[in-house]
Amino acid sequence: MRYLTIALSKGRLTDMSVELFEAIGIDCTELKNSSRKLILTDEKNKIKFFLAKPSDVPTYVEYGAADIGIVGKDTLMEEGRHLYEVLNLGFAACKMVVAGPAELMGKLDRLTNKRVATKYPRIAREYFEHKRKESIEVIKLNGSVELAPLVGLSEVIVDLVESGRTLKENGLVVLDTIADISARLVVNRVSMKMKSERINPIIDAIRKELEKR
């Protein structure tokens, strides 16, 4: 039997992904041990795991280096890869929003400098230029995006919000919600056809596990 390869996102999704796979009977012992190995295995079920930067997971899955992946919907929207998004796993839930000073509430069509700061340039551009039909300048940031409106770099930001506390502490509010975000199970298109006898039982087992929660 050939191995199935699963790519997991490093960081906040790792523990929740491991818990889910263990709940359906997949051995994740090697994943839980702090090992320097890059590829970890469940020999009994013939499954290989590797941890990757979240933004790289869709790439590994699209090109078939991984058959299955777990990644946030925000990453899928930003990366725009060709793969199957088969399950909403429900965990790591948050929202992708447009945020800015409270005085801009209801006035997104009247921005003066038309600059939007974000870690998600594709999502920001899609929202403003396609949904709102507005021409904007997107400024890509890698750090604390909330800082941008405070120092005059941009009028608004596009970012993930969980509790909204960070926005509130910085005098910002949610101006619009772009999408509900959570972890998703994704599958390579060729693997879905060629390895369906291995992949479909995993999808079904995860679906049943989620229904119990």
UniProtKB/Swiss-Prot annotation:
Location of the protein in the cell: Cytoplasm
Any GO molecular function: ATP binding
Superkingdom as given in the UniProt entry: Bacteria
Keywords: Amino-acid biosynthesis, ATP-binding, Cytoplasm, Glycosyltransferase, Histidine biosynthesis, Nucleotide-binding, Transferase
Transmembrane segments: none
EC number(s) given by UniProt: 2.4.2.17
Record flagged with keyword Cell cycle: no
Cellular component, GO annotation: cytoplasm
Reactions catalysed: 1-(5-phospho-beta-D-ribosyl)-ATP + diphosphate = 5-phospho-alpha-D-ribose 1-diphosphate + ATP
Disulfide bonds: none
Pathway given in the UniProt record: Amino-acid biosynthesis; L-histidine biosynthesis; L-histidine from 5-phospho-alpha-D-ribose 1-diphosphate: step 1/9
Annotated function: Catalyzes the condensation of ATP and 5-phosphoribose 1-diphosphate to form N'-(5'-phosphoribosyl)-ATP (PR-ATP). Has a crucial role in the pathway because the rate of histidine biosynthesis seems to be controlled primarily by regulation of HisG enzymatic activity.
Record note on domains: Lacks the C-terminal regulatory region which is replaced by HisZ.
Protein family: Belongs to the ATP phosphoribosyltransferase family. Short subfamily.
Protein's UniProt name: ATP phosphoribosyltransferase
Taxonomic source organism: Acetivibrio thermocellus (strain ATCC 27405 / DSM 1237 / JCM 9322 / NBRC 103400 / NCIMB 10682 / NRRL B-4536 / VPI 7372) (Clostridium thermocellum)
